[in-house]
Curated annotation (Swiss-Prot):
The lineage of its organism: Archaea, Thermoproteota, Thermoprotei, Sulfolobales, Sulfolobaceae. It comes from Sulfurisphaera tokodaii (strain DSM 16993 / JCM 10545 / NBRC 100140 / 7). NCBIfam families: PRK04286.1-1 (NF003287). InterPro entries: Metallo-B-lactamas, RibonucZ/Hydroxyglut_hydro, UPF0173_UPF0282_UlaG_hydrolase, UPF0282_hydrls. PANTHER family: UPF0173 METAL-DEPENDENT HYDROLASE MJ1163-RELATED (PTHR43546), UPF0282 PROTEIN MJ1629 (PTHR43546:SF4). This is UPF0282 protein STK_23220. It comes from the Archaea. Belongs to the UPF0282 family.
Length: 308
């Protein structure tokens, strides 16, 4: 099994787009890219827009040779109804989606999911609601969790987690569980016993606003418990990498991981490149070059449609 992170915060954009290849199938998870509409009171910098354009093209090219596309929920850094990445990426694919009508918040149920499904009409070979189901392709098994909250409560909706198992082991893609602050986030991890996990981490950059100290502590303790249970790799990247203080936030997890021989890294480090935290450094980018970005029309529509 081969895991390739395609777009993450450590690669310069808001995303968790990932390619997983087994001898049976090529699976593209959450093919979307986005930017923070405002950060530190500032709009996206031109470097962020350029990086988004680059990674969107990369996802588009890779999509041509995949068999399966998975959408874990309907936030714009995890799905794209054609704003930035052409909807044609779904042509002739098998598409597994988060249930668009059950265990879902209102903005996704009544706006985002219906818009996405209308855009997909007649394009994929098949669309399958995946919540709580398993699918077998040769010696590869796709195991989907039931819907779990996007973080400590349901305000941001629900997501589905994905386990991919073959003879080499099991990869777990947690989607946006915000570092697993709830026990039900851990249930799926215990069920599938992954040796490789891709997890988003807590919303620590919003501590005191969208994240309480109590829930941050729960996330850290639960991530510590995850790395104690047979892991080899943990890519922790997405929400937590929007925080300039992410090293201190993740320090307890990394210390436990070291004791258990687990490698905890960002998507960029996994690929062998330097992390490029453009959003977290947006203030510094504008200090170096203080001019607003030229926003392409599709990206403008995406940013206008709401934050992630």
């Amino acid at each position: 099994m081969k895991v390739t992170p395609l777009a993450f915060e450590s690669l310069g954009v808001r995303s968790q787009a990932t390619l997983v290849e087994t001898k049976d199938v090529r699976i593209l998870i959450d093919p979307a890219v986005s930017l923070a509409p405002r950060r530190y009171g500032l709009p996206p910098h031109q470097l962020e827009v350029d990086k988004l354009t680059e990674l969107a093209k990369k996802i588009y090219e890779i999509s041509k040779d995949v068999d399966i596309i998975v959408i874990t929920h309907y936030h714009y850094d995890h799905h794209d109804p054609g704003y930035v990445i052409p909807i044609e990426i779904y042509s002739n694919k098998m598409v597994f989606i988060k249930d668009p009508t059950n265990n879902i918040n209102n903005s996704q149920k009544y706006r985002r999911a219906p818009k996405f499904l209308r855009a997909l009409k007649d394009i994929p070979n098949k669309i399958e609601v995946a919540d709580g189901k398993e699918f077998i392709f040769g010696s590869t098994k796709l195991i989907f969790s039931k819907a779990v909250p996007h973080g400590a409560d349901e305000r941001l909706g629900y997501v589905i987690q994905l386990g991919i198992n073959d003879k080499d082991g099991t990869v777990l893609f947690t989607s946006d569980i915000e570092g697993a602050p709830k026990e039900q986030h851990l249930d799926f991890t215990k069920k599938i016993s992954p040796n490789f996990i891709i997890i988003d981490g807590p919303l620590s950059y919003l501590l005191g606003r969208a994240l309480s100290e109590e829930d941050l502590d729960k996330s850290i303790k639960n991530m510590e418990s995850i790395v104690k249970n047979g892991l080899q790799y943990a890519i922790i990247d997405h929400h937590v990498l929007r925080d300039l203080n992410h090293e201190n936030v993740l320090k307890p997890v990394k210390e436990v991981a070291k004791d258990f021989g687990v490698k905890v890294i960002s998507a960029a480090e996994y690929l062998g490149v330097e992390p490029n935290l453009l959003e977290a450094h947006r203030r510094e980018l504008f200090k170096k070059e203080n001019k607003p970005a030229r926003i392409p029309r599709g990206l403008a529509k995406l940013l206008h449609a709401g934050d992630n």
